[in-house]
C-alpha cells in the first residue's frame, strides 16, 4: 500500500535478554523505551526483598529478589552476592537466551557528535555478530565495520577472525574511575567520543566495566561470574573486573575475541568516593597480585569447554591467591558452586535459547 511503512524487527529480538541489577524504581527505562521495549528484561533486585520495585508499563520482564534467588538455588545461592551489583550475574544464569546485555540503572541514552540518540544495544549486537581480531592488530581498528577493512600487511590467512564473545561499551560524562582517582579529580567528565571499536589483543588484560556490557552467553556465559562482593565480604566494586580478568584468560585459551569501544552510554551520576574507598581499599592492594596471576595463568589443552576452563581457574585461584587472604579460598569455592548452579539450571545437550523459563517466579512475570 502506498505510503505504508513496515517497522523492521529489532535485531535478535528473541535471542537476547537485558539484565538490570537495581535497588530502586526503574524510571530510567522510559528514556530507553524506543530501544529496549521489544526485548525481554531480567531485573535482579538487590537489598530488601520486601521493597516494591516499580517498572514502567509496557515492558516484558521478570523480576527476581533475594527470596527468589534463595528459592531457586537453595544452598548454592551463597555464590550470589548481596548488597552489590554483582548480583546481576544471577540474571545471566536464569536467562535462556543466546545473548545478554547488562546495563546499570544510572545509565542514560547518550548522543553522538551529531546530536543523534545512540542505540547502544544495536551497536553491541553488531559488535557481537562480527568477528574479532585477537591474534593480529588491525591499525584501522575493527576491519568488519562499514567503511573499514584490513590494512596492507594484515595476513590473509587470519582475515576470517575469531568469534566475538564480549562487547565492552564505554561511557560519556562520569568516567568509571576508582576511588583515589575520583577524589583527586572530582569534577572530571569524559566528553570525548571516539568512533572506534577494537579487539583487545590476545595476552592483554583489561578492566572490564559491567555497566554497559554485552556478551554471547553460549560462548562465555559460564565464566561471567561476578564473584563474592558486598555484604559479608571484605571487598566491593571489583565484581566486573574480576569477571573480566577470568573471561579474558579463558577467551584467549579458547580463541575467542573481546571488543571494546562503541557504544557509549551517558553515565549520569558519580558514586560516593569515600564509600567507594572503603569497598575498594583491599582490592587496590590485592589487584597488584591478582593481575600478574591472571597474566601468567595458563589452562591445559584438554580444557575445551568454558566450564572446564573456569573450574581449572578456580583451582589456580585457591592454590596461588589464597596466600594473600583467606577470602580467595572462599572465592575459589564460590566459583565452583557457581558452575554447579549454572549446570543445574542449564543442562548440557539442550538448546539454551529454546529451554522453557522453568525458574521464573510466575507471580513476577510480565
From Swiss-Prot:
It is an enzyme of class 5 (isomerase). It is found in: Secreted, Cell wall; Cell junction, Plasmodesma; Golgi apparatus. Keywords: Cell junction, Cell wall, Cell wall biogenesis/degradation, Cellulose biosynthesis, Glycoprotein, Golgi apparatus, Isomerase, Secreted. Expressed in all tissues tested, including root, tuber, leaf, petiole, shoot, stolon and stem. GO terms for molecular function: UDP-arabinopyranose mutase activity. Glycans are attached at residue 152. Reversibly glycosylated by UDP-glucose, UDP-xylose and UDP-galactose, but not UDP-mannose. Its cofactor is Mn(2+); Mg(2+). The record marks 152, 159 as: Required for activity. Transmembrane segments: none annotated. Its EC number is 5.4.99.30. GO terms for biological process: cell wall organization; cellulose biosynthetic process; plant-type cell wall organization or biogenesis; protein glycosylation; UDP-L-arabinose metabolic process. SUPFAM superfamilies: Nucleotide-diphospho-sugar transferases (SSF53448). The conserved DXD motif is involved in enzyme activity. Belongs to the RGP family. Homopentamer or homohexamer. This is Probable UDP-arabinopyranose mutase 2. It comes from Solanum tuberosum (Potato).
